[in-house]
Amino acid sequence: MTHPVPIQFQSPDLEAIASSAGRIVVFAGEGGAMGVAAKRVNRLMRGALERAAASEAFGKLKQGEAMELGFPAGMAADAVQLVKLDRRCDVATARKAGGAIGRSLSKAGTLVLADTIQRAAEVSFGIALRAYDFTPHKTGEKTVPGPVTMMVANPETVAAEAGPMAALAEGIFFTRDLVNEPANVLSTFDFAARLAAMHELGLEVEILEEEDMEKLGMRALLGVGQGSEHPSKLVVMQWKGGPEDQVPLALVGKGVVFDTGGISIKPAAGMEDMTMDMGGAAVVAGVMRTLAMRKARANVVGLVGIVENMPDGNAQRPGDVVRSMKGDTIEVINTDAEGRLVLADVLWYAQERFNPRGVIDLATLTGAIIVALGHENTGVFSNDDAFCAAFLKAAQSEGEGAWRMPMGERYDEMLKSRIADMRNSTGREAGSITAAHFLRRFVKPETPWIHLDIAGTALLKGDTALAPKGATGWGVLSLDRLIRDMLEK
């Protein structure tokens, strides 16, 4: 898998700055305020840095943005990057500043002169996240950034703060790698194998095969994958880092490794992006990896239904009726509304087996949520106000966009079927809401539940402050924060 770039922390050495090759990064706040190390660079550059910080171009920069000064006189470095950042900044701005650095690391090495910036660990986290580069399928010489060193006033303290963030970066990168992989590489077999390998980190991993799910009555999930040559699987990952009597939190993910739409086949244009339809399962996997790597003091179980939705002579048809593990029957109106069928059985299994304190499911579930919220926010649905508020607070603190969507009985009535207990698709109107109501039917009344529709946030066509175009890893940060707040305090 792709690993974050390692970052070393050391005390400031002003005499070493002039001879440092590669790229030098310095910070200046509003009005051009600079620390000791930046002032040293300014002297070496004969005032050029101060003039840049006083320029109109620098004045127009927002906090966390940067400008370049190429081939600085008086220094061995190839370039100096001037980042606009106040010494006392918030977490999101510090990460954004790190992202500006991470997008342009030098092959010859990068020296970050953080001085006394209070959020230096968050800056390093932003560097790591933005430096992500998915290259396993590219041939030829690959550009590998040189060593990254951060000179900071209190290196031991910053290194200790950055430790858990390194585990988070590993989890986010694992999620991004899974979502970015093509379906001919990430089959249901390979996905399950990658998750099983995490037992080396201390996770308990169990794989349920099709015959196991058949015995449990999971015909909703199994029907989705019956047109594929690759068998469906249910992977259960348990992290038991909390007290024995702590009731676990359950995370449930949709893992459709490729979605053609089945017999209700999708248009060809854009179908290549349906390799990301396992994004919910990838986030669950990334969170579980993070918990194991940082030795979280919490009990969490992650469950992912892994299937491939393909059309062939054995594929599920529009009009079929399937029986879920719960016992409810479902009329399949549209085979391209398959994710909710997968989640229905996994949600019920999670509650029956683990009786969790709460369940959070994640899925690239509907295009309707993109129409409603674009690519800035994940749609949040819940049956429990307090649980939902805790999640929204966690998402806001981590800078991940999330917006609560409405639910109501009139939407639930739209699921009525003429021949079964419910139907899996209701048409275009309120598509993300009716999908959430479908899932809610497989949540016990006493179970706090959150549904996260990440169709608009799991993969993006353009760069962001903390990720290149492609998979974002949205959700790992928010869920890890929620687990810290709920289970580890």
From Swiss-Prot:
It is found in: Cytoplasm. It holds the Pfam family Peptidase_M17. Its cofactor is Mn(2+). Mn(2+) 1 binds at D259, D336, E338. Binds 2 manganese ions per subunit. One of its GO terms (biological process) is proteolysis. One of its GO terms (molecular function) is metalloaminopeptidase activity. Its EC number is 3.4.11.1, 3.4.11.10. It is an enzyme of class 3 (hydrolase). The active site is at K266, R340. It comes from the Bacteria. Gene3D superfamilies: Leucine Aminopeptidase, subunit E, domain 1 (3.40.220.10), Zn peptidases (3.40.630.10). InterPro entries: Leucine_aapep/pepB, Macro_dom-like, Peptidase_M17_C, Peptidase_M17_leu_NH2_pept. Presumably involved in the processing and regular turnover of intracellular proteins. Catalyzes the removal of unsubstituted N-terminal amino acids from various peptides. This is Probable cytosol aminopeptidase. It comes from Cereibacter sphaeroides (strain ATCC 17025 / ATH 2.4.3). The gene is pepA.
